[in-house]
Amino acid sequence: MAALAVLHGVVRRPLLRGLLQEVRCLGRSYASKPTLNDVVIVSATRTPIGSFLGSLASQPATKLGTIAIQGAIEKAGIPKEEVKEVYMGNVIQGGEGQAPTRQATLGAGLPIATPCTTVNKVCASGMKAIMMASQSLMCGHQDVMVAGGMESMSNVPYVMSRGATPYGGVKLEDLIVKDGLTDVYNKIHMGNCAENTAKKLSISREEQDKYAIGSYTRSKEAWDAGKFANEITPITISVKGKPDVVVKEDEEYKRVDFSKVPKLKTVFQKENGTVTAANASTLNDGAAAVVLMTAEAAQRLKVKPLARIAAFADAAVDPIDFPLAPAYAVPKVLKYAGLKKEDIAMWEVNEAFSVVVLANIKMLEIDPQKVNVHGGAVSLGHPIGMSGARIVVHLAHALKQGEFGLASICNGGGGASAVLIEKL
């Protein structure tokens, strides 16, 4: 009867207040208090990035994920039993077996009872995994989580359609192209979308080549100066009949001949094209992971945070304009955090193509000297499920105390994700 009275608006005020309090409590069923929890990164690591069919080709994505998860937990200095849940980004899952994140998690020795989820937001997958884990921690659903991304493009299979074999034989399709690098709406390669952006914003081949050479140069300088040392978890590879091989450095940035860059033919648009194999990112293997927890959990476990998650956002545009999508995610993040672009000490804009970074620098009107200061995917490599997590990992180590860093990555289908962190 009381419920009926509420529906008709005649219930007495004390009873109404009681019912509303119950509803408010139910609405906070995932939180122990009415405010959101602060979320911190207590460790951040990644594997070296292997070239396509290169040093890491023997390692499936799930194994790379295992190594990153293990490395993150070891660097955090916490028991594996403290990790309540794991999210990992992974894009091209064909042939990997069921539940790739579950495989990576159990391979890392976490308890059987640890829930696991694989996230696929194309190139933004690793970053989206971090964002989703942060949301779970903010609302109090969990207090310690691992998140990141993994990809082995060297191990992606070819497929053929099911059904009767047609006259003339069957056609094999490369899942790297079909599931990773093709705009399904316009039936064109991601590189053609990049060409569209170059034309729309009047970004020349010469500008893109210059940017790519700069990326390779900055990556080499950063490696020589030890800028990546703290974020790397080495990989030991067993070779039958030979000594183990330890991979502890990125492979891709060394594979460049600057004299050939301006001479390369364009790949996606033969006439008046601008995108080449040199000024685009490459196909690669690798994984990255962070240990995230609430500030209260960090105090309980007596661990020193690297950084805090300050804000994050997604954005979406026309699929063909996916290279521009970060320019729509970034303002959302700055608005949520109450910051201006001048407050950002370091920017990471994923280098899917050189034109992506040039376009977003132009649209956001940000200082190029603060963008990808240690190189990016053009020179380091772009394992697509890993890259969004990798740029967050790098900011967590590269920033100085009190500085803000903003990482953003575009993804196929017209999307982008962005994460703002503050170094602690």
From Swiss-Prot:
Residues 1-30 form a transit peptide. The modification N6-acetyllysine is found at K63, K171, K178, K187, K199, K220, K227, K242, K248, K254, K260, K270, K335. SUPFAM superfamilies: Thiolase-like. Its EC number is 2.3.1.9. The modification N6-succinyllysine is found at K63, K75, K171, K178, K187, K199, K220, K227, K240, K242, K260, K263, K265. Activated by potassium ions, but not sodium ions. One of its GO terms (molecular function) is potassium ion binding. Disulfide bonds: none annotated. PANTHER family: ACETYL-COA ACETYLTRANSFERASE, MITOCHONDRIAL, ACETYL-COA C-ACYLTRANSFERASE. This is Acetyl-CoA acetyltransferase, mitochondrial. It comes from Rattus norvegicus (Rat). The gene is Acat1.
